[in-house]
Design a protein with these regions (language model features):
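Structural signal for the C-terminal ends of transmembrane alpha-helices
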Residues: 59-67, 159-166
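Short, Lys/Arg-rich, polar N-terminal cytosolic tail immediately upstream
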Residues: 1-9
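Immediate flanking context of iron-sulfur cluster ligation sites
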Residues: 20-39, 58-61, 123
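Non-cytosolic membrane-interface motifs at loop->transmembrane helix junctions
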Residues: 38-48, 74, 103-106
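Interfacial segments of alpha-helical transmembrane regions
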Residues: 9-19, 66-86, 156
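A hydrophobic membrane-anchoring alpha-helix module
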Residues: 125-179
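Extracytosolic (periplasmic/ER-lumenal) interhelical loops and adjacent juxtamembrane/interface segments
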Residues: 96-142
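C-terminal TM-helix exit segments that contain a strictly Trp-centered aromatic cap at the helix terminus
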Residues: 28-33, 83-99, 117
């Protein structure tokens, strides 16, 4: 199994798959917001930022997956984004399962002054909903609970890919017309 993760990590197809999966989740979030009329909360916006971090890691990995430095940089960005996204989504689930006046998220995102994403890209990062509202569910899980599952799966995959980097594997190249 580590062989598969190592092989995918040194090929562009693995990083492209990561990029496409993160962008598909972002597209799904935008569909829920603009197509179905669900309002994102501050925690939803923070989870989007974490997903964009994973997509950015996919772009870094696409640039030069055979170079160890680029691959490790992409893995670090992906791993940290998945960890942060997992912690944020767990807190989001806590807001939904234990709503109370003293256990609420803020209504305005707290981005750094040098990177006010909610001002620069309000279509993507402007929150309008409440964190304690669970207005959508599928198979008995709310959207925030599904995001916990998604970030946990991403984290496990990145952990396996990171461990696989220490395994020596022969990567067989396909025959090329030109060298």
């Amino acid at each position: 199994m580590l062989h598969l993760f190592k092989t995918l990590s040194v090929q562009r197809s693995g990083w492209l798959l990561l990029l496409i999966s993160a962008l598909a989740l972002e597209g799904t979030a935008l569909y829920f917001q603009y197509g179905m009329g669900l309002q994102p909360c501050v925690m939803c916006i923070y989870e989007r930022v974490a997903l964009f971090g994973i997509a950015f890691a996919g772009i870094i990995g696409l640039i030069a997956p055979r170079f160890l430095i680029m691959r490790v940089l992409a893995l670090i960005v992906a791993f940290l984004s998945a960890v942060k996204g997992l912690f944020i989504s767990i807190k989001h689930v806590d807001y939904q399962l234990h709503p109370a006046p003293w256990n609420q998220c803020s209504y305005l995102p707290e981005f750094p002054q040098t990177l006010p994403l909610d001002k620069w890209f309000p279509v993507l990062f402007h929150p309008t909903g409440s964190c304690s509202d669970a207005v959508w569910s599928w198979l008995g899980l709310s959207m925030a609970q599904w995001i916990v599952v998604i970030f946990a799966v991403y984290l496990l995959i990145f952990l396996f890919v990171l461990i696989s980097q220490f395994k020596r594997v022969e990567i067989h190249q396909s025959r090329r017309l030109f060298k």
